[in-house]
Amino acid sequence: KKVPYWRSLSYAFTDFYFSAITPSATGGQPMQLYYMVRDGFGAAHSSFSLLATAAVYQMTVLVYGCVMVGANLSFVMGQGRIIRLLLVFGVLVNGFCSGLILLIIFHGLLAEKIMLCIAGGLSRAGIIKNRKRAIRKVEGLIDEYSRGGAYLRQYPLAAVRIFIHSAVQLTALYLVPYWACRALGISASAKDFLALQAILSLAVTAVPLPGSVGASEGSFLVLYRTLLGAGQSFSVMLLSRGISFYAMLCISGLATAFLQFARRGKPASPV
């Protein structure tokens, strides 16, 4: 069933809003799935589309960031220890997640064995209290991603389209500080800002804070200080972060509220 454009846009706003207010952006997809199912789109088809999009987007962020790190390696190595550690942490977390997704897509049984071993180890260490419940969650997650992976294997061009769309989306997002500079009358190179934002995103994306609040602002000031100076980097940070996160948080919150109450009392449309 084809999802109308405006309905898709409202789901995207929902994803942004709940991702922004939950640690490590964990709340976006479950709420997207909730609203899609509530609106009459089948749970299986909804989860397929969300999982496929999330899998490719995760890999796009990693590839984009790693390419920019490789192209600006000397700049990265010249940063402080905290930035380098954040970057390594981000690469490891995103790399692990992307690798696990690929493993599930192409070899679900092996991925299930690995995740069950990890769950067993965490249970023996006392980190996981309810081992059976954790195993059920792992098996359910593997099953969902395997079905999404089967779709991507059957329609590889869909993955290519999602990758291209994600790359364009990330490019637009990463260029917000550049346009903030231009708005403030500061001369800047779009290429430098694109590289810095890709590195910054990769460094803070895995920080378990809602919207990476604090980590994003602090890392922004450290990275951009060498390019703009302390005074200008603070002004650019306020404007660009205000546009790309706080303004979008308000807009997506209003859109989510509309989505929540607009269909209250209306029956779900048939699938």
Tell what function each PLM region has.
Residues 1-17, 180-196:
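Membrane-embedded helical hairpins/re-entrant loop segments and their flanking transmembrane helices
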Residues 15-130, 209, 213-271:
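Transmembrane helix-loop-helix hairpins in multi-pass inner-membrane proteins
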Residues 60-64, 141-144, 165-177:
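Core segments of transmembrane alpha-helices
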Residues 150-164:
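Membrane-interface helix starts
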